Swiss-Prot record:
Belongs to the insulin family. Residues 236-245, 291-305 have a biased composition (Basic and acidic residues). The keyword Disulfide bond applies. The lineage of its organism: Eukaryota, Metazoa, Chordata, Cephalochordata, Leptocardii. Residues 115-305 are annotated as: E. The keyword Nucleus does not apply. GO terms for cellular component: extracellular region. It comes from Branchiostoma californiense. This is Insulin-like peptide. It comes from the Eukaryota. Residues 107-130, 236-305 are annotated as: Disordered. PANTHER family: INSULIN-LIKE GROWTH FACTOR II (PTHR46886:SF1). SUPFAM superfamilies: Insulin-like (SSF56994).
Amino acid sequence: MNLSSVYVLASLAVVCLLVKETQAEYLCGSTLADVLSFVCGNRGYNSQPRRSVSKRAIDFISEQQAKDYMGAMPHIRRRRGLVEECCYNVCDYSQLESYCNPYSTAPATATPVRTTEPQPEEAEDDPLDGMVGDQAPLGSIENIENLVYHYDSDDITIDAAKMEPKKLKEILGSFEDKKANPVFPFIRQSKNIKPNKFPDSFAHQFPTDLVEEEPTNEIPESPSQKPTLERLGYKHNQTDKKEPTENNNNNNRARDNRTKSSTVEPHTVPDYISKQYTHKPLITLPRGTPRRIESRDSYHLTELR
């Protein structure tokens, strides 16, 4: 071997070392741990590298098998650890990846998702469907039985409202003011209790007394039957056939008649309601000055309206 061939071999050895240094790196301590964590990710790593089945089989062959195949016990290389291979020597990416644990082939357990079955829609028709605004009664048909109502244009029984909801709808739609006026929103009554009837059109603005009565089959009054003064306890003073003697007595008698005729016992109003409503007499008769009218038979004492 001449000198030139020695230089060529030496130069080739230097080039190989330089290439190896550029592709590998010495890794030790925390730097090695950080690089392995980056390469392996969530799999983690171990201190011994993963090897193929053939190499693992060679590692664990018995001495008799070695003698049979090769005639002598082969030299089995001791496994180097992670530090010995990457810190004392250099290791590349493929060597680092061999220390990572294998990927898990088991599928991830998915969290069961609860699904709600669609509920079937109710196909029942509401008997009060379509009654909107002021026409709609308060609550359901069951609540109508327990509420006290007063109607301006008509008076129907609660039983009819319960048994015939369509009839109630027709009646409510036929009113001029298009609504039913409840006497008080939540006054409940028994079956033998019914509200008093008011004589004038402003009666529905005030609460009523509940009067206990026996169940009867009487027919409700028609709207044409207007309340008269005789029904309200007013007794018209018959004309006095005797001629009054003194004007003072005539004035006193006329004042007494007006007081008796215009005095009506007001309805009892609870204390918690009287603070909210201003109670007024339900009937106010017009007042005027009496005058003397001369006729053929006698003098009549009347009142101006």
